[in-house]
Curated annotation (Swiss-Prot):
Coiled coil: none annotated. This is Glutamate--tRNA ligase. NCBIfam families: gltX_bact. Its main location: cytoplasm. Monomer.
Length: 476
């Protein structure tokens, strides 16, 4: 049996990290078992589904490196097949029209709650006579279609993550609605639990891998598999991603969409690396930093945890910084040029850009950090308090004047770093000023602060752009 798994997102929002982690686990499982990873866009919510969200989801998966093996299925294009299945269930006596109004159902639920019972449909219209149906139709009532769930049934499966799971059908809320309300002679839009079963069967899905919040749905869907005569897939219910308080991660916790992580400057490799660790434990000796290829060669559900996985920003940022630090200077430069362009900064030469990237790379956690780390090399900085104080100490400006005079006499000719060191040494010897004072004063004048990257390399970069003398002179 060839493994076939799927991701079935609803295009009602951008690709959420929870959905992306589900996609990742599906993809890894397919890769490990030489199977197929498929996409089904569940766009049956007509009001909220938008093409822009479908594009966002697919682009996000591509950015993460999670390529699908067949053309995506659009669920709404199968509505005819869905309605035909409902007709078949009605004809077999496994589904029926329920004419209960929303007001009647709410009154029923209120009474159950007041009696200390869990709200559930009481199956009141399961055995309507023809006369009763005709009266409801004459009264102009619309109807939903409900699937019969017998109270004495037991649902069970061996979950790939959680082991044996048993569910009493009496705890599933009564007969299940499988189509929206519509005029009595019509069938309304088919609903989630039914269409998922129909589509998974049509796509020959062998393993359904999704979040633990779908466990109750799985119990209902297994009853539908049985009624429809379909072979049941295997199920794996993965742990939810939690916030720092142990609640399900949501938009209220800040950034949760993959496109936002990308915009902030996270790398796709760091994202897939970190998401794999959200609920999965790597084998001993593998460590926490690995590629998609490495994790796909060892991924299995025996190492997926039951408990929720807390989102750890610090670990994600560490993985991201490690990934950036391992990039070649060329790759990082290619990522930074568009960001610099947005700031209005023009790169004079690739060689200069590569030297700048090499200088700032160790300081980067996010790709976007390259904007602020680079700013001082593109824009004349304001002097910070520590720089102003440094320039006010005795002999600081005397040293800078000496450096300025020497700069006018000394051609750099591509030897910026060597000449910078020679000038500092010459100044120290000629004026009998400690090198520490000279270097701090130069840093204050050139970079506007006493903090920052290596002074000699920074000075060399500014000299290549002929910006060093002007910055020193403004401080005299």
């Amino acid at each position: 049996m060839k493994v076939r798994v799927r991701l079935a997102p609803s295009p009602t929002g951008s690709l959420h990290i929870g959905t992306a982690r589900t996609a990742l686990f599906n993809w890894l499982f397919a890769q490990r078992n030489k199977g197929s990873f498929l996409i089904r866009i569940e766009d049956t919510d007509k009001e909220r589904s938008k093409d822009e969200f479908t594009s966002n989801i697919l682009e996000g998966l591509q950015w993460l490196g999670l390529k699908w093996d067949e053309a995506p299925i659009i669920q709404s294009k199968r509505i005819h097949e869905h309605k035909e299945a409902i007709k078949s269930l009605i004809n077999k006596g496994l589904a029926y029209r329920c004419f209960a109004t929303e007001e009647e159902l709410q009154t029923m639920r209120d009474a159950q709650i007041n009696s200390g019972e869990a709200p559930r449909y009481d199956n009141r219209h399961r055995k309507l006579t023809k006369e009763q149906e005709q009266k409801f139709i004459k009264d102009g009532r619309s109807a939903v279609i409900r699937f019969r769930i017998e109270d004495e049934e037991s649902v069970h499966w061996n979950d790939m993550v959680r082991g044996p799971i048993h569910w009493n059908s009496k705890d599933l809320g009564g007969d299940m609605v499988i189509s929206r309300r519509a005029p009595a002679n019509e069938i309304g839009d088919p609903l989630y639990n039914l269409v998922v079963v129909l589509d998974d069967a049509a796509m020959e899905i062998t393993h359904v891998i999704r979040g633990e919040d779908h466990i109750a749905n799985t119990a209902k869907q297994l009853l539908l598999y049985k009624a429809l005569g379909f072979k049941e897939p295997s199920f794996a219910h993965t742990p939810l991603i939690l916030n720092k308080d142990g609640r399900k991660l949501s938009k209220r916790d800040g950034v949760t969409s993959i496109s936002d992580f990308k915009t902030m400057g996270y790398t796709s490799q760091a994202m897939t690396n970190y998401m794999t660790l959200l609920g999965w434990s790597p084998p001993e000796g593998m460590g926490e930093k690995f590629t998609l290829k490495e994790s796909s060669s060892v991924f299995d559900f025996d190492r997926v945890n039951n408990a929720g996985a807390k989102f750890d920003w610090d670990k994600l940022q560490w993985l991201n910084s490690q990934e950036i630090h391992n990039w070649s200077n060329e790759k990082l430069l290619d990522s930074l040029i568009p960001l610099w362009t947005k700031e209005g900064w023009n790169l004079s030469s690739k060689d200069w850009g590569l030297k700048l990237v090499h200088l700032i790379k160790p300081s980067l956690i996010l790709i976007n950090d390259g904007i602020e780390e680079s700013r001082v090399f593109f824009e004349e900085p304001l002097l910070k308090k520590d720089a102003i104080q440094q320039l006010e100490i005795p002999r600081a400006k005397e040293a800078l004047k000496f450096i300025c005079r020497k700069l006018e006499e000394t051609p750099w000719h591509g030897k910026e770093n060597e000449i910078a060191i020679e000038l500092i040494t010459s100044c120290s010897k000629s004026l009998d000023i400690k090198k520490g004072i000279i270097m701090k004063s130069l840093r204050a004048a050139l970079l506007g602060t006493l903090q920052g990257p290596d002074l000699i390399t920074s000075w060399g970069l500014l000299a290549m752009m002929e910006n060093d003398q002007a910055r020193i002179k403004r401080c005299l």
